[in-house]
């Protein structure tokens, strides 16, 4: 088993910034891999080994039974990930504003992206979060949990579901959610939201199977579009 723990700090003394942005580049292949990364400060990057200073590409993790723990504490941080794994456990924490989370998990069906357990915690505003799970595979038994506290955040999730569960809890104004779940087996999406001026678009399109959706939202000036389609007539939002 491989385990790596990385901690970075950006320090301030007498009001002057002494250290430039931190960048972590990762390319890992093999099973049973654990990685912990913590970055404290602003403008930090986590991505791939072919990145160059100031320009980040997606990190590359290939294998099965992997655990990834990412903590970025500060503003304007960026995490880009290209993960190919079965039995993948991911914990992603972002505390700050204007952060970017851009991850795809097994998009080409190398391992199938089964039995993943993902938790995404966001505290802050103007963050851009994107997760693509098993676009050409089946996210069997996926357990996905989001906790978002802040305003003007954008969350995009695209999942090829197979008995997957997706729980999202949002507290804040002017947030946007775009969720697309398709595949050949049913999935469950539960969204709890508290805030104003929200825009929520949900598409559930399991081919000839059942999908479940529960939305509880409290606030003013909301726009909702819900599409459920099990291979019937094509529909779209106005």
Q: Where does each model-flagged region fall?
A:
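Sec-dependent N-terminal signal peptides
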Residues: 4-13
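Low-complexity repeat regions of mature extracellularly deployed or surface/particle-associated proteins
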Residues: 20-238
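Sec/Tat signal peptide C-region and signal peptidase I cleavage site
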Residues: 13-21
């Amino acid at each position: 088993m491989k385990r790596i723990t990385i901690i970075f700090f950006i320090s301030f003394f007498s009001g002057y910034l002494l250290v430039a942005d931190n960048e972590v580049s990762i390319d890992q292949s093999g099973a049973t891999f654990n990685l912990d990364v913590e970055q404290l400060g602003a403008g930090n990057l986590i991505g791939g080994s072919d990145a160059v200073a100031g320009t980040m590409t997606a990190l590359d993790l290939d294998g099965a039974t992997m655990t990834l723990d990412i903590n970025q504490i500060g503003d304007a941080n960026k995490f880009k990930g290209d993960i190919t794994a079965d039995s993948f456990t991911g914990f992603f924490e972002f505390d700050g504003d204007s952060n970017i989370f851009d991850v795809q998990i097994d998009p080409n069906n190398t391992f199938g992206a089964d039995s993943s357990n993902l938790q995404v915690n966001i505290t802050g505003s103007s963050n851009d979060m994107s997760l693509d799970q098993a676009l050409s595979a089946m996210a069997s038994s996926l357990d996905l949990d989001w906790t978002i506290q802040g305003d003007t955040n954008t969350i995009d999730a695209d999942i090829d579901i197979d008995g997957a569960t997706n729980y999202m809890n949002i507290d804040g104004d002017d947030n946007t959610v775009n969720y697309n779940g398709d595949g050949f087996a049913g999935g469950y999406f539960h969204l709890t939201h508290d805030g104003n001026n929200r825009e929520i678009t949900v598409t559930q399109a399991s081919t000839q199977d059942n999908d479940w959706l529960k939305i509880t939202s409290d606030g003013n000036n909301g726009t909702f579009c819900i599409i459920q389609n099990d291979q019937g007539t094509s529909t779209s939002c106005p």
